[in-house]
């Protein structure tokens, strides 16, 4: 059951853009992980820039070895 949790700075995405993003990500997961559409869930959380350090400290830095795409920045 893949669950994708996207955190990003705020973006002005309308519902159609969010649906297109979800569809594209779903297609990639189906292709690479051989998942069923019904098993995939995707979360989009918009985080204010001044709060990003907390995301880095709790979710990015401790998981650096497990990341399959590492960030090109550090904090």
Curated annotation (Swiss-Prot):
The answer to whether the entry has keyword Isomerase is: yes
Residues the record marks as active site: 2 (proton acceptor)
Mind listing the UniProt keywords for this protein, alphabetically?
Cytoplasm, Isomerase
Task: Give the GO molecular function terms.
Answer: intramolecular oxidoreductase activity, interconverting keto- and enol-groups
Listed Pfam families: Tautomerase (PF01361)
Top-level taxon of the source organism: Bacteria
Question: What class does this enzyme belong to in the EC scheme?
Answer: isomerase
What is the first-listed, main subcellular location in coarse terms? cytoplasm
An annotated GO cellular component of this protein is: cytoplasm
Q: Which residues form a coiled coil?
A: none
Q: InterPro entries this protein is in?
A: 4-OT-like_dom, Tautomerase/MIF_sf, Tautomerase_PptA
Query: What EC numbers are recorded for this enzyme?
Result: 5.3.2.-
Q: Where in the cell is it found?
A: Cytoplasm
The entry's family comment says: Belongs to the 4-oxalocrotonate tautomerase family. PptA subfamily.
Listed NCBIfam families: PRK01271.1
The subunit field of the Swiss-Prot or TrEMBL record says:
Homodimer.
> Could you identify this protein by its name?
Tautomerase PptA
Species: Escherichia coli O127:H6 (strain E2348/69 / EPEC)
